[in-house]
UniProtKB/Swiss-Prot annotation:
EC number of the protein: 7.1.1.2
Segments passing through the bilayer: 3-23, 25-45, 66-86, 96-116, 122-142, 145-165, 178-198, 200-220, 237-257, 274-294, 325-345
SS bonds (residue pairs): none
One GO BP: mitochondrial electron transport, NADH to ubiquinone
Annotated membrane topology: Multi-pass membrane protein
UniProt protein name: NADH-ubiquinone oxidoreductase chain 2
UniProt GO MF annotations: NADH dehydrogenase (ubiquinone) activity
Keyword field: Electron transport, Membrane, Mitochondrion, Mitochondrion inner membrane, NAD, Respiratory chain, Translocase, Transmembrane, Transmembrane helix, Transport, Ubiquinone
GO cellular component, one term: mitochondrial inner membrane
Role summary: Core subunit of the mitochondrial membrane respiratory chain NADH dehydrogenase (Complex I) which catalyzes electron transfer from NADH through the respiratory chain, using ubiquinone as an electron acceptor. Essential for the catalytic activity and assembly of complex I.
Location relative to the cell: Mitochondrion inner membrane
Stated family: Belongs to the complex I subunit 2 family.
Any Pfam family: NADH_dehy_S2_C
The species this protein was found in: Capra hircus (Goat)
């Protein structure tokens, strides 16, 4: 793709996100969603192959359906309130449709079907944008309509997402699909805490984006997309492979890594609000995610995949791609736990 065209498209994606975040008018929010969706598709199709085309088509159809649901909710709200302002959804049907549309855009269960397939079919750089930047817009709208959200519906979607995110990743060998199911589970954690403490949802979103960005940048540096190719990078880049595995464990929420912080704080906040059964179920289900991350770490470090690769240790002579942000992101993705007392300002 021509670099100038790519920059223009990327700026359009950012503009669409900005329009949604600063708007208080439903029509402008819908326009921002559409700009964002239509601009991301050429980025997903950077590599012209059938898989990228199919993934982009799936993404377009799913997001178009979600946009139609969103517009229907806006029109129902307009009929009952007579205003376009984002203040309150005046009808339960509008609230339900809006929540379902945003859940579909976020890739939450039971609307998660598109996330693994789309992520698997596109390049790593496009997958990074899809699983990080594209979550900002729906989350910002959920944050704005928080007083009107049906609590039972949003918590049901949350617990379903955490379960599907754990179960779906168990039999995967493709790293992009593992990241997609991890994203589904993290969306569940974020929306679960949203009704109780919206500020904590923002903290969780920041940590999630940091960890996911680190993972994708490490995958791009290692040129790995499967568990087999990850295990074979020990010979070439042992330090980078170690960072991949530590960050994976952080995403699973293993203490004392950064990924443990949001889970700990979310469970603590929910128990303070006399919700006991739901956080217990969430904590147990989160073990599924941790299990497949630990299994991946074990199989990569302590066992050797069947391979005809007889290459010797090349890491002393290999040159790696220079990535400026990677050291900072890696530190943030793994070592935030000692800073947890500072987060008492969220109380």
């Amino acid at each position: 793709m021509n670099p100038i065209i790519f920059i223009i498209i990327l700026m359009t994606v950012m503009l669409g996100t900005t329009i949604v975040m600063i708007s208080s008018h439903w029509l402008r929010i819908w326009i921002g969603f559409e700009m964002n969706m239509l601009a991301i598709i050429p980025i997903m199709m950077k590599k012209h192959n059938p898989r990228a085309t199919a993934a982009s088509s799936d993404y377009f159809l799913t997001q178009s359906t979600a946009s139609m649901l969103l517009m229907m909710a806006i029109i129902i709200n307009l009929m009952f309130s007579g205003q376009w302002t984002v203040t309150k959804l005046f009808h339960p049907t509008a609230s339900m449709l809006m929540t379902m549309a945003l859940a579909m855009k976020l890739g939450m269960a039971p609307f998660h079907f598109w996330v693994p397939e789309v992520t698997q079919g596109i390049p790593l750089s496009s997958g990074l944008i899809l699983l990080t930047w594209q979550k900002l817009v729906p989350m910002s709208v959920l944050y704005q309509i928080l007083p009107s959200i049906n609590l039972d519906l949003i918590l049901t979607l949350s617990i379903l997402s955490i379960m599907i995110g754990g179960w779906g990743g168990l039999n995967q060998t493709q790293l992009r699909k593992i990241m997609a199911y991890s994203s589904i589970a993290h969306m569940g954690w974020m929306t679960a805490i949203l009704p109780y403490n919206p500020t904590m949802m923002l903290l969780n979103l920041i940590i999630y984006i940091t960890m996911t960005s680190t993972m994708f940048l490490l995958f791009m540096a290692n040129s790995t997309t499967t568990t087999l190719s990850l295990s074979l990078t020990w010979n070439k880049m042992p330090i980078m492979t170690t960072l991949v595995l530590i960050t994976l464990l952080s995403m699973g929420g293993l203490p004392p890594l950064s990924g443990f912080v949001p889970k700990w704080m979310i469970i603590q906040e929910m128990t303070k609000n006399n919700s006991i059964i739901l956080p217990t179920l969430m904590a147990i289900t989160a073990l599924l995610n941790l299990y497949f991350y630990m299994r991946l770490t074990y199989s990569t470090t302590l066992t050797m995949f069947p391979s005809t690769n007889n290459m010797k240790m090349k890491w002393q002579f290999s040159t790696t791609k220079r990535m400026t942000l990677l050291p900072t992101l890696t530190v943030l993705s793994t070592m935030l736990l000692p800073l947890t007392p500072i987060l008492s300002i969220l109380e």
